[in-house]
Amino acid sequence: MRHVIFRVEKERYGLPLSAIREVVLPPATFSRVPRAPRAVVGVMNLRGRVVTVVELRELLHLSDASSPMQKVVLLDRGRRDLGLLVTEVDGIESVEKVSPPPGHPSPSVRGITRLRGLAVTILDPEGVDGAVAALFGHK
């Protein structure tokens, strides 16, 4: 199965290509959403559609760092537009085997794979969507 591989800081992540609508550059500024959870960067206008953008680093509870977030990965979620702010997109790769994640992983994590000797955490698009919905108190 083909996956979009991207980085959040130095960590590599992947999402199934079938779950991605497109990858775009972030706007110079996002429109802030009052009282939004910390992970919500804001909203952006993309060709007339309002897209909620979430900082994946914050959603996954990764440490704060200073690397600039340079890409927005847009999930194909039907009627709702959701963007994930990431450090960089590395490309599209074929992922053959995904091992179960160790310990008690987040529902956002499907498993772990290795590409060119490097670990890649494969995310579950439904789990990511659910984590974002939970930020707003939805189930």
Residue ranges, per PLM feature:
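An acidic, low-aromatic, low-complexity terminal/linker signal
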Residues: M1-K139
